[in-house]
Structure formats: C-alpha cells, structure tokens
Amino acid sequence: MRYNQFSYIPTKPNEAFEELKGLGFPLNKKNSDKANLEAFLRHSFLNQTDTDYALSLLIVDAKTDALTFFKSNSDLTLENLQWIYLQLLGFVPFVDFKDPKAFLQDINFPVSYDNIFQSLHHLLACRGKSGNTLIDQLVADGLLHADNHYHFFNGKSLATFNTNQLIREVVYVETSLDTMSSGEHDLVKVNIIRPTTEHTIPTMMTASPYHQGINDPAADQKTYQMEGALAVKQPKHIQVDTKPFKEEVKHPSKLPISPATESFTHIDSYSLNDYFLSRGFANIYVSGVGTAGSTGFMTSGDYQQIQSFKAVIDWLNGKVTAFTSHKRDKQVKADWSNGLVATTGKSYLGTMSTGLATTGVEGLKVIIAEAAISTWYDYYRENGLVCSPGGYPGEDLDVLTELTYSRNLLAGDYIKNNDCYQALLNEQSKAIDRQSGDYNQYWHDRNYLTHVNNVKSRVVYTHGLQDWNVKPRHVYKIFNALPQTIKKHLFLHQGQHVYMHNWQSIDFRESMNALLSQELLGIDNHFQLEEVIWQDNTTEQTWQVLDAFGGNHQEQIGLGDSKKLIDNHYDKEAFDTYCKDFNVFKNDLFKGNNKTNQITINLPLKKNYLLNGQCKLHLRVKTSDKKAILSAQILDYGPKKRFKDTPTIKFLNSLDNGKNFAREALRELPFTKDHYRVISKGVLNLQNRTDLLTIEAIDPEQWFDIEFSLQPSIYQLSKGDNLRIILYTTDFEHTIRDNASYSITVDLSQSYLTIPTNQGN
C-alpha cells in the first residue's frame, strides 16, 4: 500500500482539538502528549470495556507493549507514535513491517507529528490497510450513533444515517416529451432510496438505461457482421446544424398531493451511492424513456433522452409533476429534497451525466462521470469508418437500443407497443448509416460537445487510459472544451473500462465526500481538489498531479528512411481465424511474428518523455485502390513491470459503506512484468484524411500526406525505452473486415511522429 491522499483538508491545532473533542475524545490541552494519546486510544476501543487488555495488544516499540509503556515514566517518542499509528491503521508489526520509520517512508505516509492534536486529527482521516479511514471505522464501531442527523469531520459527512430504516419508493415523473406519438407526455419511473430524517437532503442520481433490465437476445440478434466491403464514397462536404436546446414551459399541477404509493425491496445499487446514502444523501435510479416502467421510445443518446432525466432533477426542484402511478391522478412532491443533485455512474451512466450537464439544468451541482461518452459518433465510428467499441465487434447504436428498450420485457407493454417500436427502430437503423461510416445530422444530435458552453455544474471525470471501449478521446475532448468559468477535475488511471472508487491507492471516495459536502450540503470546508490527477505508469500505487490533459510542446521523431508496403488481403484460413477471434489477431500483431500484414517501426528513445495528449502520425502514403483503411498502434515494447488493466481484489468485502452496510472488495491494479503495453491507437478512412466532414477521392498510386491523430494518453517514457509503431489496414477488433486486395505504401523518410509533452519534460 502507498498513500496518495487528496481529501485531507489542512487543519490548525485548535480546530483539530475542537473536532476531536466534538467526537467525544477526552483530550485536554493541559495534559502531556503521552496522556492525550492514551486517552485517545482508550476511547477508540469502542467494543471493549477492558481497555487495559486492548492496550496490552498494541506495542510502542519492538519490545514494549502499550499498556506497559503508559504505566511507565518513559517519554513519548516519535518512534512510539509510528508504531501505534501503523497498528491503528491495520498494519501488523513483524508481518507488514519491522522498521516503522522505513515503512512509513515507503508507503508515503502523510501525517506529521509536530502537534499531537493535529497529528491525531490527520490520522483519523487516513485510510487503513482495509481501505476505510480510521474515523469511518470508529463511527461504524459506534463512536457516533446513527441518529439520522449530519455530523462532520474534516469537512466530510459521516455515516450517521440509519441504513436499517431506509425509505424505498417509486414515483413517475412527467416529461415534456412524446417520443412515440402517443398523445400523452412520456413518464419516467424513478426508484428512490432515502434515509428517514427530518432534514431536507441532497440527491445522488444515477441515470442508467440499464437499470430496469436489458434484452440480451434482441441485442444479439441485431448485432452486425463485421465482414463486408469498405465503400468507395463520393467526394463531398458534410453539413450539419446544431439545434438549440428547447423545452416546453411547465405549469404547476392542480392534482391532489399524495405520498408515494409504490415501493420496492431491491435494486442493483452503485456502491459509491451507498457510501453517500449512509451519510445523508438520497439515492435515485432512473432509466429514462423507453425502459420498463416508463413510457416512450429509447432514443439512445439524443437530447430527448437527456430531457427525460432532466425532468427528474426539475421535479426535485418543484418545477414539474410526478405521479403516484400511471393513472396520473395524484401528484407526489419531493418535499424531502433540498433540490441539489450530483450524478454518478460509469459508461452509459456517466454519459448521461455529461449530457445533463450540457443542459445547464438548475440544481445539478456536480457530475461524477466515469468513462463517459462525449459524442456518440466517436463511440461507434472513427474518422469516417464504422468502428466498434473495444471488445464488442458488430455493436452499433441501434443494437444498444434493442438492449436497453426494456419495455419489451413487460409482456403487456410488448403487445401494445412493439409495432410502433419496431418502426422507430428501423428509422434509427437507417439513420446511423453503417454503409459510409460518415458523420451526419443523426450523430451531430448526439454530440454533447455542441452544447458544452451551457455547463454550470462542477465536473469530475474519471477515465482509464487503457479503456478501448469508451476511448480516452471522449474525456480529452469534453474536459478541454469545458467553460473556463467552472471547476473541473480529472482522474486518469491506468486501467480499462472500470470504476476506481474502491481502489487502495487513492482516496477517491473521501475526496468526493469533501467535494459534495461543500457543494450539496453547503459546508464551508475550504476543500480544494487538483485539476488533473494521473496514475503514474512507472511506479506501483503512485498518483501525480498535472495542470492539464494535453501538453504545450511537441517532440518530433522520424520513422525511417525507406518505403514499406502493407497488404490488406489475407488468405482464407488466416482471415477466418482472425474474424472468429480478434484476440488472435491482436496477439499476432503485437508480437510482430510476420503472420499479420503490418509495418513495424521500433524507435529506441534517446531521452525521457512525459507523453501528455494526442500523438500524431504525419505520413506520406499511396494506395493501390480508391479505398483504404489505415490503422495504427503505439506500444511501449520490451520486458519490464507494467500495470494490468483490470483491478484485482486486495481484501474481500473490507470496504464498509456505512455501519456494516453494502460492504465491497478493496481493489488495485496489479503491477507485474510484461512484454508490452498499448499506449495509443487509431483508425482512419483515407477518404476522410483532411477532416471528418470532408470526403475526398483517392487517386491510386499517387502520393499524398496525412496527419493522423491517435487516442490521447498520459504516459511516462524513459531513455532507452523502445517505442513500437505498428501500421496496418484492417483492425479485426474495431473496423469493417474487408479482405479486398489492396495495399498501402508508406514513405518513412517523409514521415514522422509527434509526441505531445510539457515544455521542459
């Protein structure tokens, strides 16, 4: 374990003393540090009346137990504190460490020892080996009662809301939409979980089209074959219009007011929401239009879908109506809500957070968007090509519609609405235009970057630099496009398409607690969070701070001095093998074993580079045909320790999200020896070589220059590392699998790579 603490708010000695006293610790400024430490320890043994015995099980050095020490006349030393602190945090002497000073240095322990009250205060805010902060562990053990009132420590809400007395209710919010032309406004089902309390409380909202169920068989049947011919496109310039964000004016309902009349027992929850539920935040889960329990069509990513979620935030602020049932005869008021909302969730869920933020909806104070899509074109297309998300060849937006239109999982809904649904789905399948792979109005209507200037909320993004599902370009684009007037924060980790709130190496939960206590509970805690926090790829459990995602300097590296050719065509056996399992293709491609058609360029680095942003390939090429795909990958190649991209369990169910509530595993990315690491990649239709909206003809056997931007990353490269560039045509994981006989020739003498860095790195 190594500490990377971003959540602790520096506290003065007097403030620390008062907070400790407020928690019930019997400290006294007139007493010695030794006496105060003993009082602190005895009060911490919440489950034991025999505190002498508890003290006797701790040691203050390699030979002395704590009970003996406190009965002696020995002075308290720094070494004594180090032994005690480590044990309180769950580290075991003679197992985890023998030399506390060296161990504390190794784990980057953040606590200082100048003042006993400051020191104990900071210790309470530190995470233990199990992943829980010491204060959270003590509260769970009974330091404070679950009295359904707010209690704070170091600017963060504590788990003092009783999760055994939760209210679970369902309401149906009226939207301004009629997505299936039914003649009535669409309703969206809202599942609410909230503590029983006299306070008006803020809300953690997860907008999840998956939460009411998914239709795997329908999606599987809709999934496309990737084998086919790459189209030769007619030269043209694509034109699109950005539509203003409009909404109907709402009028107050005159219906009788009623409490919610529908309840539920269970819903798949997000554990970060659970963490905040025990700390006085309501949890709501909304699947939006076109899902089971709601009405309407699954419009998949456009602003109609976004508005169906926005309506829920408006209801929390008293602006729109929610009904007790589909009868629409009684309304429910969110009289428990303070009107302030934070949205959470990964992938599609985080995507809806981004979309909501771009509406500028009142009451949305914070989005915590993890692995979020910023424009749907970049999820299912790339540079004029159909480009499947990593791991899902053949998926497209209409396939996702089939997956998430869960109304068809309710038989009564199916027989009444399926004909209309199928007609709308067919329209969607035509609009996505798999034939050309081009950007069009349909995709433009699902591009949240067009409305990014409307964002008013505070923004937190997390993203994996090894996420080839929702690729890093999504967060790179949206983060750098956000208005300068807002506060924004970005956590970039070395994993794939995963959550990071339950990792050992970073206090993400506690950082969000400080931020949301500030923004949603109005606590003036002076919490400040860095703009870009990045997981160092060279060292285990180490996070660094940067000013920006994207460097201000470009380094240029030549690619060679010869001309090399890439064939597109494979023999039938190889083609069928790669179509059957794209992982076989990737393995052969990365090994460079002459089984795949590729140009491999090895670039031994002559100095250190902190790659920060989008690498670009500047290539001089010619093709033998009027169509061509160019694909590229950049690898850090050669044996050394690197991160795996999926976190593994450190301790099973050690993370407590309240008082023994919604426990989950503590995880971390393994750091082990490996042969290579993909840094970046990309695919390009050479007919879209100038920009996305310009389609150009290809003159066979005529040289032309292209600039090819690859996926952004932050990656530390060292002198002597081998940067491997692979150029090829068809990518069997992502692109159309056209086995036509064409070739691309690259003049390496006229080609180079630019690496974005920060000046001075």
Swiss-Prot record:
User: What biological process terms from GO does the record include?
Assistant: proteolysis
Location comes to: Cytoplasm
| Chief location bin | cytoplasm
What Pfam families does its record include?
Peptidase_S15 (PF02129), PepX_C (PF08530), PepX_N (PF09168)
Which cellular components does GO assign to this protein? Answer: cytoplasm
- What protein family does this chain belong to? Belongs to the peptidase S15 family.
| Name by which UniProt lists this protein | Xaa-Pro dipeptidyl-peptidase
What GO annotations for molecular function exist for this entry? aminopeptidase activity; dipeptidyl-peptidase activity; serine-type peptidase activity
Q: What does this protein do?
A: Removes N-terminal dipeptides sequentially from polypeptides having unsubstituted N-termini provided that the penultimate residue is proline.
Catalyses which reaction(s):
Hydrolyzes Xaa-Pro-|- bonds to release unblocked, N-terminal dipeptides from substrates including Ala-Pro-|-p-nitroanilide and (sequentially) Tyr-Pro-|-Phe-Pro-|-Gly-Pro-|-Ile
Provide the E.C. number(s) assigned to this enzyme. Answer: 3.4.14.11
Write out the catalytic residues in the record: S347, D467, H497
Question: In which domain of life is the source organism classified?
Answer: Bacteria
Q: Which InterPro entries match?
A: AB_hydrolase_fold, Galactose-bd-like_sf, Pept_S15_Xpro, PepX_N_dom, PepX_N_dom_sf, Xaa-Pro-like_dom, Xaa-Pro_dipept_C, Xaa-Pro_dipeptidyl-ppase/CocE
Protein's UniProt keywords contain Hydrolase: yes
Its quaternary organisation is: Homodimer.
- The first-level EC class reads hydrolase
Question: Which keywords does this chain's UniProt record carry?
Answer: Aminopeptidase, Cytoplasm, Hydrolase, Protease, Serine protease
Question: What is the gene called?
Answer: pepX
